[in-house]
Amino acid sequence: MRYLTLIAVFWQVLNCSAYTHSGNPTASGVYPKVGMAAADHLPFGAKVTLPDGTVVVIRDRMGGNYTDKLDLFKETEDECWQFGRRNLLCKIEIPS
């Protein structure tokens, strides 16, 4: 038997920012680490590719019901400040 996995792929300009450790697990129940991100409008497990080729997986929520924001997890507060806030054209892959 063969299975066909469908993946929705689209591009969206996202307002990107960064966050770091709070000591608490993410909304999906796992503890945050580099390579994870928060978004209200994308399902857990969706992959987002940034323009520099970095791929992050949605594992958290922002809590504001935003449809155009992405919050990237960084190891330190300094890395968050260095990243700042950017509007980036991102590739989004949503698994079936």
What annotation goes with each model-predicted range?
Residues R2-S96:
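Solvent-exposed, well-ordered loop and adjacent helix/strand elements within mature globular domains
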